[in-house]
Amino acid sequence: MAAVKEGADAGDSKILLISSDGQHFQVTEAEASMSKLVSNMIEDGCTENGVPLPNVASNVLAKVLEYCKKHAAAAAAEDVAVKDQELKSFDASFIDVDNTMLFNLILAANYLNVPSLLDLACQHTADLIKGKTVQEIRDMFGIVNDFTPEEEEEIRKENEWAFEN
């Protein structure tokens, strides 16, 4: 059973999320609702047998849920200043992951529609590549240049503004 009432409060209800590799994650409705995709499924009553997430592996889903749990708890906190400082500190350590996990977090946050996580991961990526050359970025993310020199030159001309210092 996916939606089990544990108390009178709807936030106490548990939702079962199922990763692409079949792992099951029981989370509160408040945590699950950080994802607009899952929130819509809850509203539509589509969570009875669990919510399959075919585009998110268990290791990535666990990381996303760590983020959702902290942010859902912070949303319920009363002291705004303390909450903001705690989240800022949490986010800084949370997003300090290897490039593969960062890439997977971006994909998962986009798929699950968790805007704040997507913003955090994209901003971190932007910070990582800021000031780097095209080749340094390729090396950092393991991107193979499959353009011919002519194609590359054409792209540079079309996007000249991006290559200005």
UniProtKB/Swiss-Prot annotation:
Keyword Acyltransferase attached: no
An example Gene Ontology molecular-function term: cullin family protein binding
Keywords (A to Z) from UniProt: Host-virus interaction, Nucleus, Ubl conjugation pathway
Segments crossing the lipid bilayer: none
InterPro entries, alphabetized: SKP1, SKP1-like, SKP1-like_dim_sf, SKP1/BTB/POZ_sf, Skp1_comp_dimer, Skp1_comp_POZ
SUPFAM superfamilies, per the entry: POZ domain, Skp1 dimerisation domain-like
GO biological process: jasmonic acid mediated signaling pathway; protein ubiquitination; SCF-dependent proteasomal ubiquitin-dependent protein catabolic process
Protein's cellular compartments: Nucleus
Signal peptide: none
Pfam families given in the database record: Skp1, Skp1_POZ
Pathway(s): Protein modification; protein ubiquitination
GO cellular component: cytoplasm; nucleus
Interaction with the F-box domain of F-box proteins: annotated segments: 106-164
CDD domains: BTB_POZ_SKP1
Subunit structure: Part of a SCF (SKP1-CUL1-F-box protein) E3 ubiquitin-protein ligase complex. Interacts with rice black streaked dwarf virus RBSDV protein P7-2. Is able to form the SCF complex together with CUL1 and the viral P7-2 protein. Interacts with D3.
Homology family: Belongs to the SKP1 family.
Protein role: Involved in ubiquitination and subsequent proteasomal degradation of target proteins. Together with CUL1, a RING-box and a F-box protein, it forms a SCF E3 ubiquitin ligase complex. The functional specificity of this complex depends on the type of F-box protein. In the SCF complex, it serves as an adapter that links the F-box protein to CUL1.
Name the UniProt record assigns to this protein: SKP1-like protein 5
Gene: SKP5
